[in-house]
Amino acid sequence: LVDIASKIQALFLLPPGIIIVTALLGFLIQIRWLLAGSFIVALSFAALLILSLPFTGQRLMADIESRISPLRLTDAADGGPAPGAIIILGGGRYTEAPEYGNRDSVSQVTLERIRYGAHLHRLTGLPILVSSGSPYGEQVPEAELMKTALESDFQVAVKWIESQSANTLENARYTKIMLAQAKVRRAYLVTHAFHMPRAVWSFENEGIHTIPAPMGFTTLNKEDRETLGYFPSASGLHLSSIALREHLGMLWYKLKHGKVKFSPATKPATAN
């Protein structure tokens, strides 16, 4: 319930929710103070326009993703313990998928993560741990869906299933227990690039040494880079919303946990 409440609050702090609320506030203020209310309404629509540009979304994402580098496997021996596992974080589910007999499946975001996790497994031969629970009380934990997809679609076995977590901090907390029992001191961590800085901090805070294995970096196609990126679109607003949500998440970590740094200087050494 706490996780649901936090997500509802985020809806009103992120676009388009916050823009709608601000615009409505402006319309109400217009009743008594026409000029001030009109300014707030105009500012709201200007914000909507700017945040709907794919170029804006890409720049907001780049501010996060530039804190982390793509994984290179040429030399993982950087003086730290050898990695003993691959941790893949869940990213949501596809609820009651009609094409799969109305059974839940992994979302597109989660599918992208397990695909890269399977790729990394084939390169390293390391066992896989999938991590995600049932934050909204679903009958089948997301980690179970990830295991099914990895084994049936990618022919990759899953060794550990962490199915209690409802957020990134809990991913780290419950994963720590499993890895400690298996005497794994360090692991590759797979999640989207925009989520990686916060994920790395969460795991390091629990004492789990990770090698970030980010995927899904934000790129613009040729049309968006040259022309369409400067025209508002629903996809542009969606991209901006994802980036701002992650910025909001990092701000919350700083407020809740004190001195938190999401920067290249604080990330663990990567393989290179």
Language-model regions, residue ranges each:
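Membrane-embedded alpha-helical segments of integral membrane proteins
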Residues: 1-29
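Hydrophobic alpha-helical segments of integral membrane proteins
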Residues: 1-9, 56, 60-64, 244-251
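Alpha-helical transmembrane segments of polytopic integral membrane proteins
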Residues: 21-22, 53, 57, 257
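Membrane-interface helix-boundary motifs at transmembrane edges
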Residues: 29-37
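Hydrophobic membrane-insertion alpha-helices, especially the h-region
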Residues: 39-54
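A structural signal for short, hydrophobic/glycine-enriched beta-strand patches
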Residues: 50-233, 240
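Extracytoplasmic/luminal low-complexity segments enriched in Pro/Gly and acidic/polar residues
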Residues: 224-231, 236-272
